[in-house]
Amino acid sequence: MSPVVILLILVGALAHATWNLVVKRSAISGPTFVWLTAVGAGIVLLPIGVVVALLEPPSWPDLALAAAVSAVLHVGYFLALQAGYRAGDVGVVYPLARGTGPLLSVVFAIVLFGERPGPLGLLGAAAVIAGVVVIGLGGGRANWRAARAGVFWGLAIGVVIAAYTLWDAHAVTALAVSPILLNAGTSTMEAVLMTPIAVRRWPTVRGVLRRHWRDVVVVAVLSPLSYILILFAMRLAPVSVVAPAREISVVFVALAGWLLFKEPHPVARLSGAVVVVAGVALLAASR
């Protein structure tokens, strides 16, 4: 990979880890927080998107399709993420969610397309599974009982991550949609989709904004920024290389979960996160 791609991946991973830690802190706010961050991201990205569209007019039907599908998937992702962070530790949910996507891509390739992974692919899949087991069971039975809900949500979120990663990669490559326009359109449609919920809960929305406006701003900026950086990296390097490399963020989050939130079993969870990253890297090397 070129230095530019490496820089894009590292900055994107750090930004992604940061906003997830903020979401964990605000997880009790639920769908209203998700709506507020979508509105905030739209406010930030729409003016930039207008300039990009004027300078390089897109195919509007392709952009509309790409943004609509991505918005549905991302709404599901953010709602599941909120539920996961309410139910479990960030040091469990985040690594499992980020490691499940690449593993599922291998499973889908075997089941749907009849592909047969080589030794590296099988070793990578085994490493991801081993990392999941270490995170869930590393502290013994007591840790498993405490981590069970987080494990469930982490795996469920990973399914959604696999879906939106494949779709968005298709949008910026095959459909040639600008990453900035895709994110601007997606954030706008996310806000539109969730507006009925926000209207029904308007007093709650006002309360969340009053208490968590700083968190809303951080997530509204860093969430699209982290993803835009990765999408640009996907334009410069193969998706099979970029997608696994960005998972270095799981180590950042596992460490932060211990340092910031005093989550238990830091050695087991950090070790499991490192094993997951290694497994994802092996999956990438096998392609």
Please report, for each region that a protein language model flagged, where it lies by residue.
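Hydrophobic transmembrane alpha-helices of multi-pass small-molecule transport proteins
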Residues: 45, 106-110, 119-139, 268-287
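Hydrophobic/small/kink-forming positions within alpha-helical transmembrane segments
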Residues: 13-17, 46, 71-79, 99-107, ...
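Membrane-interface interhelical linkers
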Residues: 1-14, 18-69, 78-90, 137-155, ...
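Specific alpha-helical transmembrane segments that line the substrate/conduction pathway
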Residues: 69-74, 85-133, 181-189, 239-259
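Selected transmembrane alpha-helices and immediately adjacent juxtamembrane segments
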Residues: 147-181
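Structural signature of transmembrane alpha-helices in multi-pass secondary transporters
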Residues: 12, 37, 41, 94-101, ...
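C-terminal structured domain segments across diverse proteins
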Residues: 216, 236-243, 252, 259-287
